[in-house]
Each structure stands twice: as structure tokens, then as C-alpha cells.
Amino acid sequence: MKFSLIFFSNSYPEEAGGAYAVISEMARYGDRHGFEAVWIPERHFHTMGGIYPNPAVIAAYLASITTNIRLRAGSTVVPLHHPASIVESWSVVDNLSHGRVDLALASGWNVNDFVLAPSAYPNLRELWFERIEEIRALWRGQPVNYPNGAGKATPIVTYPRPLQAEPNLWLTATKQPESFRRAGELGMNVLTMLAGISLEQLAQKTARYREGRRSAGLDPDTGTVTLMLHTFVHEEIETVHRSVRGPFLDYIKTSLMSHLQGGAVDVGRQLSAQEIDQMAEYSFERYFSTAALFGTVAETRKFALAAREAGVGEIACLLDYGPSVADIRANLPFLAELKHSFETVEA
């Protein structure tokens, strides 16, 4: 089992050094302690994650302060951007990082994000898969035809050329089993989360992924399913509860409001504050026991082993969902111990 670090939400504006101090510190820590990668999201127009409008820009900075850790778009919303723009930006990062770039490619879901590309929203899934193939071709240096300003089809080759001949690609997939199969058929990895499902249900989706790889003539046992999990590991379970309960409840409420405003959830009416509180409490209890990496090293190891049985090959540890920076720092040595326990057994 591999372990990486992923960021998604909180800007920690109170930190000295500004909004990006936390991700910078955690990326350095991950680099020193052998974590696989740091994932940088793309988020727009909301306090939750709004400091990450362009993951390539942040990755370019992280390239200058790290040496070994992979730098991953987690995720780039493909229908919002021209494929050539995606490849140009990340090729710069690939050069700056000496070939450490990987890309997770998402379809997008928040209708408000598509003020950046309103014509793309009605057929975003079709554009998603169409542009994935264009991104691959452009990365390889193959010309792709696009209409120029006069409407004439023009073959384009992007520069600078990336250092890696082939991009390592993840398909961001959560709810649709068919997306897992499609990722397998395309020879991509998968970035996913437990969005209202159990590990047992995730296992059914990872099986679809393996079926997709097999049907495409690929080794079904290769390819990585990466699972994002809210993470807090500590030697004392009481410290885990104290550190995550309040921040995680606030995180759930903010996330719920983002989904309501973005059109991903439609309940047909405006929810009351009491209803939102009740939903947050229910979600917290479910997440804590069945859908997060919360607990001692021994407890989280059991969960990670269960995830591996469900077909997961990497856990992306979400850190910035609300715990204080001091608490996040306090959890890191235990998270590193958890990671090391798998390296020792698997070596």
C-alpha cells in the first residue's frame, strides 16, 4: 500500500506565511519521509478550496522546494480548459520538477464552475473523454488539429516538451461504475473516494476497473486505484476525536452547502439549519467508523488493509479539512509510522 498527501479545502489564513504555508510545509514533510505524492486540487468560486484555482501554478512552486515526491493534479477539471493549455502548463511543471508530474483528470460537476466554459456543461462527460485522448497525444508530441482564429483546422504541437514521454494519468471517478470500467479500458489509474458507499461497494467498482483493463488487453493486476480518505492518526483515540469532531462537522456542512449551490444535490427545497446539523452529525458518525483513516496506528492499519482487500493500491490522505495546523503536525509522525508499517511488511 502506498500513501500520498492530498489537499482540498481549508486555506488556514491565520498561518504565518499566508494561505499556502500549510501545503508547502506538508509537501516538504512528505518529501522528506517518502510519501508517494502530493495532490493539488482545482477548485473555483467558493471558500472551500478556493485557494486552488490552478493546481499547475502551485505545483510549479512545490517543484522548487521538493526533490522526490510526485506532483499531481488532483484533479484538473478537463472540460473547463483547452487540452493544449493543460499540457503546456503541466509540461512546464514536468521540466521544473525533473519529471515528477502526474495528472488526475475529472469531468467536473459544479454548475457554477462552468462560468469558465458554459458551452461545455451540457456535454461535459463526452468532452472529458474526448479531451483525455487529446491530452495524451499532445503530451507525446503528436500534432492535434484545432480551429484557429479564422476557423481553419490547424495542427498544434505544444511546448515546452515534457521530460516524461508518457503522462501517468488517473481518471477521477466516484459514483458511476462505468467510469471505473472506462478508466481500465483506457489504461488509466483511478482516483476515488467513499462518497456515501462502503469499502464492500467500492470493491465492486474496482472489480469493474480490472474488467476494463482485461477487456482492453491490459494486465488486470496493474494500474492503481487511489482512495482519498480524511486522515488523522494518533496514539490516543481521544485526541483523534477531539481534533477532528468540530472541524469535520464544519467541513461537512460547508461541503453540503457547496453541493447544494453547485447543483450536485437537489432536495427540492431549502434545508433548515437544524436539518443541516442533523445531516452533518450522521455523516460524521458514518465517516469516523467506516469511511476515514481516523484512529491509532493499529486501527488505521486495519482499515488500510481492508481497503487493500477492496482493490485499493494507494491511500491519498486528506489533511486540510479543518483540524488546527498544530493538530495536523501532531498526526504526521503517526501517519508516517503507518506508512512505514506497510513498507516493512512488503519489503
Enumerate the predicted regions with their spans.
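An alpha-helical appendage that flanks or caps ligand/catalytic pockets
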Residues: P122-T158, E200-V312, H340, E346
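Short, well-ordered coil/turn segments that N-cap beta-strands
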Residues: M1-F3, F35-A37, T66-L71, L96-D102, ...
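N-terminal beta1-alpha1-beta2 module of alpha/beta enzyme domains
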Residues: M1-I65, I69-R70, E166-P167, F342, ...
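Active-site mouth loops of central-metabolism enzymes
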Residues: F7-Y20, T76-A84, Q164-K175, T231-H234, ...
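Internal, glycine-rich beta/alpha segment that forms the wall or movable "lid"
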Residues: H82-M188, E200-A203, A207, R214-A216
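Glycine-rich, proline-tolerant flexible connector loops at the mouths of alpha/beta enzymes
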Residues: A37-I58, L62, V77, W109, ...
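Conserved, mostly hydrophobic/aromatic
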Residues: G30, G34, E42, L62, ...
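Short, acidic/polar
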Residues: G17-Y29, S89, A173-R181, V297-A306
